[in-house]
């Protein structure tokens, strides 16, 4: 067997369907579109969600609240992540370079998840009450 001799097995490849090319092709005249109606005409189809003039589902259902665009600027870091980071002083830049928070993050909060054995000083980073207690018990501080 050689690379230039490899071919797909018989019946594996099908010729592209050519519509509107005469009666003998089996796809002539209406070209598989049926007779009349919007879908048979040139110029495409209705837009997504259009229900023929009936009030669409998306507009019929009630709306409530909103999704805050500020959420993408907030981030959370666990105590176990701080433990693995192994730094004495942690700030926003250190967390970004370590990849623990995204580049868009502006507000970071440390949450109580995992353990912390060494002292860590947080600069410009907030912490939950439980996380703050554990950080201070380990000899660290939250500034």
Curated annotation (Swiss-Prot):
InterPro entries: Ribosomal_uL15, Ribosomal_uL15/eL18, Ribosomal_uL15/eL18_sf, Ribosomal_uL15_bac-type
One cellular-component annotation, GO: cytosolic large ribosomal subunit
Location of the region described as Disordered in the Swiss-Prot/TrEMBL record: 1-59
Spans traversing the lipid bilayer: none
Pfam families (UniProt xref): Ribosomal_L27A
Alphabetic keyword roster: Ribonucleoprotein, Ribosomal protein, RNA-binding, rRNA-binding
Family recorded in the similarity comment: Belongs to the universal ribosomal protein uL15 family.
Protein known as: Large ribosomal subunit protein uL15
Organism of derivation: Polaromonas sp. (strain JS666 / ATCC BAA-500)
């Amino acid at each position: 067997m050689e690379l230039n001799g490899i071919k797909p097995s018989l019946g594996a490849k099908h010729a592209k369907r050519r519509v509107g090319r005469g009666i003998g092709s089996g796809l002539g005249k209406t070209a598989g579109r049926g007779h009349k109606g919007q879908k048979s005409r040139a110029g495409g189809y209705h837009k997504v969600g259009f229900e023929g003039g009936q009030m669409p589902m998306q507009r019929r259902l009630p709306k409530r609240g909103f999704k805050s665009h500020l959420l993408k600027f907030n981030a959370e870091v666990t105590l176990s992540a701080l433990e693995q980071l192994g730094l004495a002083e942690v700030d926003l830049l250190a967390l970004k370079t370590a990849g623990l928070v995204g580049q868009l993050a502006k507000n970071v909060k440390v949450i109580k998840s995992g353990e912390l054995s060494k002292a860590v000083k947080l600069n410009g980073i907030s912490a939950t009450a439980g996380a703050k207690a554990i950080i201070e018990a380990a000899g660290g501080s939250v500034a």
